Every structure is written in structure tokens, then in C-alpha cells.
A protein has these predicted regions:
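Small-molecule kinase domains that catalyze NTP-dependent phosphoryl transfer to phosphate-bearing small molecules
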Residues: 59-66, 139-184
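ATP-dependent small-molecule kinase phosphotransfer cores
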Residues: 41-98
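Pre-Walker A (Motif I) flank of P-loop NTPase domains
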Residues: 2-11, 97
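Short, amphipathic alpha-helical "lid/cap" segments that border enzyme active or binding sites
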Residues: 87, 183-191
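Conserved phosphate-donor/acceptor-positioning beta-strand/loop module used by diverse small-molecule
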Residues: 112-134, 140-148
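Short beta-strand-centered segment that lines the nucleotide-binding/catalytic pocket of NTP-utilizing
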Residues: 30-41
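RNA pseudouridine synthases
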Residues: 93, 106-112
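Glycine-rich phosphate-binding P-loop
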Residues: 8-21
Length: 195
């Protein structure tokens, strides 16, 4: 079956965003990543800046703090409002057109669809560190910290909203090591598997 929607979850520094962009170009389909922030903001009633900061990485706090966080009249926290708006936007995009969606728990949100290819991109530590130092102009020690913090928050968010383990192979159709395969080969494999 042809896969109209490709979700790409990724470790920080693995090149998942770049690979996703290239896949979308190759297939001639839409690419969604940070460009859906305004749609999420509109649906949630929050500012695009707040959504940008919190959509994929919330909840930042522990469960105790989350339990006592501010709530709206329905009892939902701000993090829950962002997540719910994000879920609605992703479902709308999947109905609207073939596309590549980066992160945002899209693999889980779209898990009941047959036309979705769920991909997880990971990489070897030395390669990810090199990429982060080059792109973010930081030293190796800072790159390791940024990578660890980001992956921890991505994993926490995924687990919190899906009750699944982020990066666990059984949650995805395809898991690719971008360090071992290279970006071009990852792109080609994803394109081929989508047909």
C-alpha cells in the first residue's frame, strides 16, 4: 500500500529534519515541521512564541508540578491545550494532503491509519556531536548537553502523551541509523518504502 503520510521522529543531531525535507522534495509532497506552529497557536489560542517553545518539548516539569499547574475551565493545563491543538492540526494535515511530518508525536497520533510510514532516525554519538557543533556553533561539551537535554525532553513528552517509549523500534515502521547509512541512503530507503 502506498504511504501518503511519512512521520519522522528523530534523535537530536541525527539529521532527521534534513532527511525529511529531502524526502518531501523527492516525492513532491508537503513538508511540515516548525511551519505548523501558527496553526497550532490558532487552534490553542496561545501565542506562536509560546507554542514554538513548548509544543514538542512539554511538559518540562515533573508530574508533581504538572499536577498543580494552572488549568482552564475544562481542567486542562496549558501543555494539554497545546498538545490537543497539535493533535488536531496533524489529523487535519493528514486528511488534507500527502506530506512528511517531523516529530510532534505524529506517529502515535496517526497510528490508526494504514497510509502512514512511521520512521525513527537515530545516529552514532560522534556524528551527532559533529553535526551539532557545526550547526549551532558550540563546543563538544555543549553539544553533548544540548543533545542529552533535548532527547530527554522529547522522550518525556512522547511517553507522557502516548504511554509508549520514544525511540523503541516496535513503535515505528522503519528505524534508520543516519551515521551508518548516510543521509542520501536514508532518504532513498524512506522514498522506496513509501511506494
Amino acid at each position: 500500500m502506498v504511504k501518503r503520510i511519512i512521520t519522522i521522529s528523530r534523535e537530536f543531531g541525527s539529521g532527521g529534519r534534513f532527511i525529511g525535507e529531502e524526502v518531501a522534495k523527492e516525492l513532491g509532497i508537503a513538508y511540515y515541521d516548525k511551519n505548523i506552529i501558527s496553526q497550532i497557536a490558532e487552534k490553542s489560542g496561545l501565542s506562536p512564541e509560546y507554542v514554538q517553545e513548548n509544543a514538542e518539548l512539554s511538559p518540562k516539569r515533573g508530574l508533581f508540578a504538572y499536577a498543580f499547574a494552572g488549568r482552564d475551565i475544562t481542567g486542562k493545563s496549558v501543555e494539554d491545550l497545546v498538545h490537543e491543538a497539535q493533535r488536531k492540526v496533524i489529523l487535519d494535515l493528514a486528511e488534507k494532503e500527502p506530506c512528511v511530518i517531523i516529530g510532534r508525536n505524529a506517529d502515535y497520533i496517526l497510528k490508526d491509519r494504514d497510509d502512514v510510514l512511521n520512521v525513527f532516525i537515530h545516529g552514532d554519538m560522534p556524528e551527532k556531536i559533529k553535526r551539532i557543533t557545526r550547526l549551532y556553533k558550540v563546543n563538544e561539551q555543549e553539544a553533548v548537553k544540548i543533545m542529552a537535554d533535548t532527547d530527554k525532553r522529547l522522550g518525556r513528552n512522547y511517553s507522557f502523551y502516548t504511554d509508549q517509549k520514544w525511540g523503541k523500534a516496535s513503535n515505528y515502521t522503519l528505524c534508520l541509523n543516519s551515521s551508518q547509512l548516510g543521509y542520501d541512503r536514508c532518504e532513498k530507503i524512506i522514498v522506496e518504502c513509501s511506494k
